[in-house]
C-alpha cells in the first residue's frame, strides 16, 4: 500500500506531548509536531530556521559551566558578561573586550562554578547588583568601556532584624572608630563577621569576633553625616537653669539651654542618658533626658543643677550604658539575600535563609540605605503572611512588584491605585498557587515568564481585567 504524507502548513500548536499522540479528534493535533528543533514557529503558522550563531571567543574554561548575562545601559550600549568559576569577562559589538595588550578584561569574583547558575541580578544604569545566598550582596560597576569593578555593597544602616526582646544587654566601649561591643550573655559567632549591629543611637559593623560575648566593630556613618554611636557636642553656648530657683523643695526638672539651638541636630533624644564635662559648677554623669527641643534639654527630677550662664567650653555626650535596646543585621554569613530587584526607586532584597518570606526595601532613591521609618521615603520591611513558610524565589519589577515563592505567586503594591509605595500603605496579595522554581524569570511586555516549581512547565503570569488579578494559565 502506498504511503501518504499529508502536507502541513500550520505549526502553531508547537511540540505535542506523547500523551496526545493519536488524538486526531483534537483540533490542535493537526497543528502540532513531535519535534520542532532549530526552527521558530511564526504567529501565522509557518516555521522559519532559527538565526545562526557566530564564534566570538572561547570561554575561559570550556570544561566548566559558564553563564552569559546581559548588561544593558541603553539600547545602544549593550554588553554580554561571561560568568564562570571565580571570574567575569565582557563582550560588546561582536567582540571580546581586551586591554592594550590584547588580553581579555577580566574580574575576579567569589562565585564558583556550582554557584554561578544561582546568581540573581538587577541593574540600574552602570551598576548591576548581584546576590547569592552564600555571599554578601555585590555590585558590578562599569566606569568605562574597559574599566569594570566588583565590590561588596556597603550597607551602613540596615537591613536589620526585629528589636531584641531578651534580657541580654550590649555595651560599646567607645563612640567612634573601632569599638568593642560586650554582650551580657553569649551572642556572637564567627558567622557574624561583616554583620551590622544597631545599638545605643548608632550602627556598627562587626569586623572580628573575640569571644561569644565580645565583638570588634567599626562605627558607621549616620544619615546626618555623624559617625558615632552616641552624640558628642562641644560648645560654649550652653547655660544651666534651676527648675526650683526659690528652693521650695517641690519636685522639679532642671534644664540646659543652648542659644545655638543644636540639641536635636546633634542627636540628643528623650530617654538618653547624658554626661557633661568642662563646666565650672555642673559636671554630671548619666542623667536621664525627659524632654528635648532644639534649644532646651530637660533632665529627670532629682538631679539638681546650679544656675550658670553660658561661656564655659563644655562637652555634652550621650552616655554609653548597657542597653537591652539593640538589633542585629538581617544579612550575615549563611543568610544572605537570594534575589534582588528595583521597584519604584527602591532596591529590594529578599529570600534569606533566616527570613525566607521577608522583603527588604531601601529608602527611596538611596539604594544602599535600608534604615526603616514611617516617612514616605523611608525603608521598609515586609513579610508575606501565609499558611506556609515558602522561600521567595524571585522578584520582578513591573507596574507592581511580582514575587514568586516556592508555594505561590504574589504582587506587592500600594493600597491606593495611584500612590507610590511607602512604609504605611504597602499591601501584598496572592495571585496564583503554582509555585516557582529558583530561576530568574523574564519580563516580556506586561507578562512574566517563570518556571513552575517542579521545573516541568513554563508559565506566563499576566494581569487579567476579568478577574482583576494576575493569572498564569
Q: What does each model-identified segment do?
A:
Residues 74-75, 124, 395-398, 442-445:
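Loop/turn segments within WD40 beta-propeller blades
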Residues 79, 83, 109-138, 347, ...:
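Elongated alpha-helical scaffolds
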